[in-house]
Each structure stands twice: as C-alpha cells, then as structure tokens.
Regions:
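Charged, amphipathic alpha-helical linker segments immediately N-terminal to NTP-binding catalytic cores
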Residues: 1-53
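Conserved NTP phosphate-binding and transfer environment spanning the P-loop NTPase/kinase superfamily
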Residues: 3-4, 128-133, 138-146, 150-419
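Glycine- and acidic
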Residues: 19, 24, 36-42, 60-72, ...
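Pre-Walker A adenine-sensing motif
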Residues: 53-61
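Short acidic-glycine loop/turn motifs at beta-strand connectors
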Residues: 60-64, 109-115
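Glycine-rich phosphate-binding P-loop
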Residues: 66-91
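Short beta-strand-centered segment that lines the nucleotide-binding/catalytic pocket of NTP-utilizing
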Residues: 93-110
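A short alpha/beta connector and helix-capping loop motif
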Residues: 113-125
Length: 419
C-alpha cells in the first residue's frame, strides 16, 4: 500500500473501475460507492434513471397503510439511525412501524404507474462501528450478531469477541487493537493521551436479513414506491426542523444547496458550511451541473411526483445545545411528512418553502419540548437566509453548467427574502 502511488480510477464510458494501493473501504469494495453510485449515476443519466446516496424506509400507520420515503444526508447526520429508527413508545403503542429497505444507496426509476420506485442494490450494511451501541442504534448492533465481518476493531483475546469505543464502558483487558498491538483499554501514547483500540472508521459488514426491522420488500424486484424524498444537513441556526419544497424544481434546488456545518473542533474551523448536494458530492460520476439537470429532466417524466422535504435535527440554542431530541423522536417529523403527502394537514408558507403549524408536530410524551420549542425550531430567520443565499450564489459560481431552472430558483429565493 503506497500513499504516493494510490490511484482510484473510474472510466464511466467504458464501465471500468481500477483501484490501486488503497485500503479504504469505499475505494476497494468496488461494488459499493464506485459502481453503485459513481458508475451507476452515469448509467442512470444515459438510461433515464437515478442512482442516489439515499436510505429507503417504510412507515406503517395503525390502519396498516404503508408509505415509503427515501432520504439523503451527508456523513455524520444520522442516516443509518434514521433508516433503522425505533419509534417512540407512544407511536409503538398505537401500532406504528418502521421498516428498513436500505441504509445507503437507492436506485430509482419511473414506474408504469407514473410514480418513482426505488430499490436497494446492496445485500447488507457497511456500518461505522465506533459509537454504535444498544442506545444509539439497537437494530444496527443486533444486525452484527452473526455472519458479520468486522474490520479494524478491538479483538478480545479472552473470548474472541469484538469491541470498539462507544459500544459499552467495559473495554477488554486482554486484547489487540486495530493495528495488532496489545491493548487493555488503558494504553497511553508518548504524550499521555489515551490510545483508541478501534480505528475511528472501523466497520462492520452485516447481511441485511440480520436486521430486526428489515422490510419484507427488501428484495422486491420492482422496489417500493416513494411518497417523499427527504434531504437533510447539520445546521445550527439556518434550516428549520422541517420544511417542504414548493414543487419538484424547487425541491431539486433544496437538494442542490444541502450543507453541513463542520463540528470537529480539532480541525480548527467550526461552523464552516460545506455544500454536499444530495449528499452526492463525492459520488457523482459526471459533471455536477449536468447531474442537477438530470434531476430536473427526471421531474418532467414523473406523473405522480413524490413531495420533497428538508430536515435539520441539529438546530442549537444560544449555548450550543441541541433543541430537538432526535433519534427515535424523528418519527414525529416523518409523521408530519406523511400527513403532508396525504394532504391531511395545512402548512405555513415562508420564503424558503412550507413549514408545519407548530401544533401539527406531535409532542406527546416529550418532556423538554413544548409548543414554543417547536415554534422556535420552525422559525425561518430572513437575515440568516440572506447570508445563505450569498453562500449558494458563491457555490453555484464554482460549478459549470448550473441549469437555468436552478438559477431561477435562487433568484426567487432572493426575491422572497426581500419582500
């Protein structure tokens, strides 16, 4: 493995991938990001379908009615957690159910009924191990109990089990770390800092059929029909908890401006906005402007379009604390999204799109979240968004061939903010 001579090459026109001297999962497991997103996105553009970096989940209500949504998030935004969500107790008691069709990749095409249909081309989950535990994501952890490959985690030599940071508070005393060195949970480096046993990007590779909440449509050849597409990012103040786009092209605009703010203090740059359109920035196999145009053109072919939403679980108060509880309680936002898809609730128009009426977000059983909290989470700060519009303009300026439709959406946004 030579860092100086490391090549990951994709030749979309020839349907060829070459990976040399890499040991990074996404660049060596060539069926995953390299083929199923980079090459497949190019094939999809030419053949009239879409390869997207999206989870697919099913939501069943107490009447037994099932709806499916696809969702795209940049890394570190809880995509796998959402794909395997366990609803709050109050929802479970009523009979709501969440099923996972896929946690990472969706191949999407227009069905004969004019709806968008999505399949998960993968056979399992390639998940980040550190931080996965029975509280953060029980379904992911339970998926790893058999027929699972673990890479770069701690090996407990006493009972031949695995461990990683964030699994529990009991690291093994007689183990080897991800580099193969002896490790006992209390190793320090030359500066006296603790040495982690598992690599931060260590992984588990588990068959999807192991997952307790895997959908019975997981292997359906036609896939599942999408009622909604959800985009998301990590924003402290800008984006509200949830908003709905005004139409398909506006939804493509919302996806194209997806962003997260950097949180790692170690890099020294906190709060820097990193644009990651549709969470596909590392995976688009051709020109980004042409990719946006493909989304616009797909909209022209879909008779029964899914509605498009944006969510932000990461709004913070002035002390930097998250306001929304997240995790299983994100079900409450999915609930509203499905209600909007079925025209069961009204919404309030803002310069950026439609936000819920605060009373339409179910807060039953939430201790620290009141109607006023929800109102705060749904505010659209016009001055903040004027700055955001400048950032979007700058981002569009860095891309070639941005479709005129998206430039028009940006102009509309600016006009709405100045009304």
């Amino acid at each position: 493995l030579s860092e100086e001579k490391r090549y990951i090459m994709h030749f979309p026109e020839e349907n060829t991938i070459m990976s040399i001297n890499s040991n990074y999962g996404g660049n060596v497991l060539l069926g995953k990001k390299c083929f199923a997103l980079r090459i497949a996105s190019f094939l999809g553009k030419n053949e009239g379908w879409m390869a997207e970096h999206m989870l697919i989940l099913g939501i069943t209500n107490p009447k037994g009615e099932k709806k499916y949504v696809a969702a795209a998030f940049p890394s570190a935004c809880g995509k796998t957690n959402l794909a395997m969500l366990i609803p709050p107790k109050s929802y479970l008691e009523k009979g709501y159910k969440i099923e996972c069709v896929g946690d990472d990749i969706a191949w999407i095409r227009v069905g004969e009924d004019g709806r968008l249909w999505a399949v998960n081309p993968e056979n399992g989950f390639f998940g980040v191990a550190p931080g996965t535990n029975m509280k953060s994501n029980p379904n992911a952890l339970l998926s790893t109990m058999k027929n699972t490959i673990f890479t770069n985690v701690v090996q407990n030599l006493d009972d031949n089990t695995v461990w990683w940071e964030g699994l529990d508070k009991n690291p093994p005393k007689n183990a080897i770390d991800w580099k193969g060195n002896p490790w006992n949970g209390d190793v320090k480096d030359a500066d006296g800092k603790p040495v982690k046993g598992a690599h931060p990007n260590s992984r588990f590779t588990a068959p999807a059929i192991n997952c307790p909440c895997i959908s019975d449509q997981f292997e359906a050849p036609n896939g599942v029909p999408l009622s909604a597409i959800i985009f998301g990012g990590r924003r402290a103040k800008t984006a509200p908890l949830v908003y709905q786009s005004k139409d398909w092209n506006n939804g493509v605009f919302v996806g194209s401006i997806m962003a997260s703010e950097t949180t790692a203090a170690a890099t020294g740059a906190v709060g820097v906005v990193r644009r990651d359109p549709m969470a596909m920035r590392p995976f688009i196999g051709y020109n980004m402007g042409d990719y946006f145009k493909h989304w616009i053109e797909m909209g022209e072919k879909i008779a029964n379009k899914p509605k498009i939403f944006n969510v932000n679980w990461f709004r913070t108060d002035d002390n930097g604390n998250f306001i929304w509880p997240g995790f299983g309680d994100n079900m409450r936002v999915l609930d509203w999204i499905i209600d909007r898809c079925e025209d069961k609730v009204d919404a309030i128009e803002t310069p950026i799109g439609f936000v819920p009426k605060a009373e339409d977000i179910n807060v039953d059983g939430l201790e620290d979240v009141t109607l006023d909290t929800i109102k705060e989470l749904l505010t659209v700060d016009v001055e903040n968004w004027k700055k955001e519009a400048e950032g979007i303009e700058q981002f569009y300026g860095e891309i070639t061939r941005v479709p005129e439709e998206l430039k028009a959406e940006l102009a509309n946004l600016k006009a709405n903010l100045n009304k």
